[in-house]
A protein has these predicted regions:
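Helical element adjacent to the flavin cofactor pocket in flavoenzyme catalytic cores
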Residues: 148, 173-203
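Gly/Ala-rich phosphate-binding loop of Rossmann-like dinucleotide-binding domains
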Residues: 46, 50, 198-200
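Glycine-rich FAD pyrophosphate-binding loop
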Residues: 50-73
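Glycine-rich Rossmann-fold phosphate-binding loop(s) that bind the pyrophosphate
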Residues: 37-41, 63
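Dinucleotide-binding Rossmann-like beta1-alpha1 core, especially the glycine-rich loop
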Residues: 81-163
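Extreme N-terminal leader/targeting segments of oxidoreductases
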Residues: 1-33, 51-57, 83
């Protein structure tokens, strides 16, 4: 079902394009690989496959516009899986959980490098993020997580003084918390539409 409303991020990205370059599937075609869905996952899969094996004939099909689904209508928060480490450790084991955390953290910089390489202005900022408590019940909730991260030597969160947290957050509601430099933001619509253009060039 077609979305009745377009989110701001996606609308802004579409408005910045002089030509949408929509190619409709009208006849039967053949390909080595067919990818269904033109969001982050579909486009990145196509890009990586083409990079590893340029001779592949890859077709990507999308019902609406590339990026018009979840990829173009999320909050644009670039947050790694750091705070999920303890849970993942119980489910998949320490080594795999560590790999998941470090991979998700390095992904921030890989996305930025990709945008820099292809001149995609996706408004990426990797300025870090706050993980805070706003009431007494929340205080200390992350302590066990931090200890687990330290034990596995992958901790990137550092406790920040209350006054500094409040200043950085712009609110006195924050009474305790940690800061991690490995967090950021992106204009999701511009990112996914930029990925589409790169994929078209490599087709």
């Amino acid at each position: 079902m077609k979305n009745k409303y377009q989110p701001f991020w996606f609308s802004e990205a579409i408005a910045s394009e002089t030509q949408l370059n929509i190619r409709q599937l009208e006849n039967k075609i053949q390909s080595d690989i067919c990818i269904v869905g033109g969001g982050y996952t579909g486009l990145w899969t196509a890009l990586q496959l083409k990079k590893k094996q340029p001779s592949l004939n890859i077709v990507l099909i999308e019902k609406e516009l590339c990026g018009s689904g979840a990829s173009g209508r999320n909050g644009g928060c670039m947050i790694p899986l750091t705070t999920k480490f303890s849970t993942m450790k119980k489910i998949i084991g320490e080594r795999d959980a560590m790999n998941m955390v470090t991979a998700s953290e390095s992904a921030l910089f890989k996305i930025k490098d990709f945008c820099d390489e292809h001149n995609i202005d996706a408004q990426i900022r990797i300025d870090g993020g706050l993980y805070t408590a706003t009431n007494k019940t929340h205080e200390g909730v992350l302590d066990n997580l931090i200890q687990n991260l330290k034990t596995s030597n992958i901790n990137s969160l550092n406790r920040m003084p209350k006054a500094e947290i409040q200043k950085k957050a712009g609110s006195l509601k924050h009474i305790d918390g940690y800061f991690s430099p490995l967090s950021g933001s992106v204009q999701p619509g511009l990112l996914v539409r930029g990925m589409k253009k790169v994929a078209e060039k490599r087709a």
